[in-house]
């Protein structure tokens, strides 16, 4: 597990109140981790803060799983 993956999973755990051990890359924020629409907005904001990036609304709507969040962060974080 790389640094970005660890950071994303830590944020997901903190924002959604789930154990990091229960978070799998294929986990859906809504279906598997119990997030509602407000949770997903707060999750996106936390990811933006953590990685110093801005996620446009149309992109944020496409991020529905842990893996999609990891992939987005990897593609958009400045090294």
Curated annotation (Swiss-Prot):
Modification type O-(pantetheine 4'-phosphoryl)serine: residues: 37
Transmembrane segments: none
Coiled coil: none
Main localization of the protein described in the UniProt heading: cytoplasm
Post-translational modification: 4'-phosphopantetheine is transferred from CoA to a specific serine of apo-ACP by AcpS. This modification is essential for activity because fatty acids are bound in thioester linkage to the sulfhydryl of the prosthetic group.
Pfam families the record matches: PP-binding (PF00550)
GO BP: any one term: lipid A biosynthetic process
Gene Ontology molecular function: acyl binding; acyl carrier activity
Family according to the record: Belongs to the acyl carrier protein (ACP) family.
Name under which the protein is recorded: Acyl carrier protein 1
Lineage of the species this protein comes from: Bacteria, Pseudomonadati, Pseudomonadota, Betaproteobacteria, Burkholderiales
Gene (UniProt): acpP1
């Amino acid at each position: 597990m790389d640094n970005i993956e660890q950071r994303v999973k830590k944020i997901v755990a903190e924002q959604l109140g789930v154990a990091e051990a229960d978070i799998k890359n294929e986990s859906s924020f809504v279906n598997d981790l119990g997030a509602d629409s407000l949770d997903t907005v707060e999750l996106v904001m936390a990811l933006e803060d953590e990685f110093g990036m801005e996620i446009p609304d149309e992109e944020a709507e496409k991020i529905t799983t842990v893996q999609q969040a990891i992939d987005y962060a990897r593609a958009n974080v400045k090294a």
